[in-house]
Amino acid sequence: MKSAEIREAFLRFFEEQGHTRVASSSLIPNNDPTLLFTNAGMNQFKDCFLGAEKRAYTRAVSSQKCVRAGGKHNDLENVGYTARHHTFFEMLGNFSFGDYFKRDAITFAWTFLTSEQWLNLPKEKLWVTVYATDDEAYDIWTKEVGVPAERMVRIGDNKGAPYASDNFWTMGDTGPCGPCTEIFYDHGPDIWGGPPGSPEEDGDRYIEIWNNVFMQFNRTADGVLHPLPAPSVDTGMGLERVSAVLQHVHSNYEIDLFQNLLAAAAKAIGCSNDGQASLKVVADHIRSCGFLIADGVLPSNEGRGYVLRRIIRRACRHGNKLGAKGSFFYQIVAALAAEMGEAFPELKSQQAHIERVLKAEEEQFAKTLEQGLRILEQDLAQLKGDVVPGDVVFKLYDTYGFPMDLTADIARERELTIDEAGFEREMDAQRERARSASAFGMDYNSLVKVDSATEFLGYDATEGQGKIIALYKDGQSVDQLGEGEEGVVVLDRTPFYAESGGQVGDTGFLQAGAARFDVRDTTKTGGAFLHHGVVTSGALVIGSPVEAKVDADVQHATSLNHSATHLLHEALRQVLGEHVQQKGSLVDSQRLRFDFSHFEAVKPEQIKQLEDIVNREIRKNTPVETELTDIETAKAKGAMALFGEKYGDTVRVLSMGGDFSVELCGGIHAKRTGDISLFKIISEGGVASGVRRIEAVTGAAALAYLNAAEEQVKEAAQLVKGNRDNLIDKLSAVLERNRQLEKQLEQLQAKAASAAGDDLSNAAVEVKGAKVLAARLDGQDGKALLALVDQLKNKLGHAVILLGSEHEGKVVLVAGVTKDLSSQLKAGDLMKQAAAAVGGKGGGRPDMAQGGGVDVAALDQALALAVPFAEQGL
């Protein structure tokens, strides 16, 4: 069976057993900061197992894409060198949320694996493990399924602590846990290894293909296991492993999924396809890189982006090792999309984007790869012992972009190891330097702990009545705030919007009788809204009723900018591609700032396209509509959700232009798109690797920006004695005239230099049969001095020349040595001495060198070095 057929058979089998087919979740875990990447099928169901989320089904089946290449689950260094380690793999899984338990889970697994209708694996090839004390599972396997006792293995606490076992699963030190049962396939006696639980279990003969986890306990802090009221099941079967079994091969790299990728990799690199480890690395890495980029990850220097960069660069290095010339890695994306695009359509829809990102990263790394490898080879040649020092590993990382594991990979090929501890010390020192150079403000919200929640009135009003339920000063709870005191006011009800989703918090004032509190900002902690500000008159007391009034003009201007960010977000996806994801935003009354994932600068013509699309939607003047619904319904309607945002059971869906823009958003917005009036982008640039930023203005601010630009055009026209209509022609004429004058000036300078050369040649002194000339020609630039040195070398014939000039407040130096002397005297060596004398640097070829410095007063002293330099070298 082909891998695609196995995947579909698994999903169809469990659908027939009443399971709901659930699509693979993103490789970016949603709302789980503990995970770098999705690494198991159960990740997307974590809240279901914890009881925090209820879904419309209690049985589920999925084929989950997974990555293990960072953090705790890191297989990167072994990939390519073993039969089963991968950065990307598919986990087939069936799940029960308080529905069926051990008997059904075991029966389902055995039926699918062994029945003729499905995989038809020989039963005598299958071994089973259970947790040592799980008699229930053992009896089901032996008495009901019929697995003989000689192929059953009980596994106890083999990891040095209670319940620390290969056959006991825990989510952490406390929480849901339970025993598991695993199914192993015996590849036969011609492969070394022993059954699970034996001393030889790490061999490759017996390979785990299925794991059933039975979540039946809750472990408390005292280590006691308490039965869960509704036990659940989490299972996993690696698609690559079971494909190897069914296709009668031992290594995962021999299955159909990899054969086409290996062939494509060999073709792109220009090498043979004969099982080299480096080729396996490339074939594996194209899968993880392709899927990560499709899910919105871009190469960067931190977090998920850095893991992606590490994988790409490891693949590039292995391709380079196989003889690749130029960029090759991106060329394999087409084969990946052809192989897996039916099951994962994002590979096809984003193929061009994935290729562009990989090609750009390859080209960037190529600039430093060769130089970095050369430096590493030099360091390894001088190495005493078999450990590469941490400072060498850090230098390669910091200067040449070599991730630590890439250097470790190269060291491994030479039977060397790296000093990881030393590398981490260097990294810590760098982080400390960065911390010392930064100043961090206090997070005031973290000081304020409020149990009560605030009812928000602001979607429908900018004024409202509330009651003071808490007061804070300097982070401490107080009973009252007096005149002139700064603090935080918490109300039971408020029309003030709290900073969220990039929109700044509202400003305004609170009135409590004679007391007034000017609100300078509004934030939120938990469900409480914090009004930050100062008492300008009277005193505020807990329990007092207040009149809350938002600065409606400021809020209105802010709301227009917020609505414009939604239109811009969709426009970006239309113009640049669906890979664009919001990475951050700041929306206030003056302008909007929108950060998004993209790998290159936005072109001027694309900026115009973005403005045209947004302004077209503004002119349509369609209503801005909101709807409260559940998260699944919202996503089914195409609503975009932001990665990392936590959404409750009920979400607010905001639609603009019908279905032009549909996003989950709790912010304040325009009533109609026409309220925005006008949209104008004022800047675009990069803020981090793979992240771009657009700043824009709307409405009156956009009009003011255009008016200011119009005034600048008028002023420019006046300067060239023209008008708006002929400004371009006038400017072109001025620039052309300037170019002509510069050319004439260069010609005059060349003539002057030539004349000076005739005079200077007479000033040369003879040193051991050679002519040595050192001269100062202030006002000449480097280009003029170079031409003059060439002229003097021809005139003098057998010479050492050093010329210097004070030019625009700095020292310019040029040194020359005729070729007949360049084996004895190097112009670059002379330049290093002279440049150092004027506080600068320089270097070059043996016959010609350039340099400079900042110490003009030392120029004559530097020129005086020419004669002793020649005397010592000749």
Curated annotation (Swiss-Prot):
Which cofactors does this gene product need?
A: Zn(2+)
Free-text cofactor note: Binds 1 zinc ion per subunit.
Q: Which protein is depicted? A: Alanine--tRNA ligase
Location of this chain's protein in the cell: Cytoplasm
| This protein's domain notes | Consists of three domains; the N-terminal catalytic domain, the editing domain and the C-terminal C-Ala domain. The editing domain removes incorrectly charged amino acids, while the C-Ala domain, along with tRNA(Ala), serves as a bridge to cooperatively bring together the editing and aminoacylation centers thus stimulating deacylation of misacylated tRNAs.
Known Pfam families for this protein?
DHHA1 (PF02272), tRNA-synt_2c (PF01411), tRNA_SAD (PF07973)
Name the gene: alaS
Enzyme Commission number(s): 6.1.1.7
The alphabetized list of GO BP terms reads: alanyl-tRNA aminoacylation; negative regulation of DNA-templated transcription
Q: What does this protein do?
A: Catalyzes the attachment of alanine to tRNA(Ala) in a two-step reaction: alanine is first activated by ATP to form Ala-AMP and then transferred to the acceptor end of tRNA(Ala). Also edits incorrectly charged Ser-tRNA(Ala) and Gly-tRNA(Ala) via its editing domain.
Residue sites binding Zn(2+) per the record: H562, H566, C665, H669
Name the chemical reaction catalysed here. tRNA(Ala) + L-alanine + ATP = L-alanyl-tRNA(Ala) + AMP + diphosphate
User: Which molecular function term from Gene Ontology is one that the record holds?
Assistant: alanine-tRNA ligase activity
Source domain of life is Bacteria
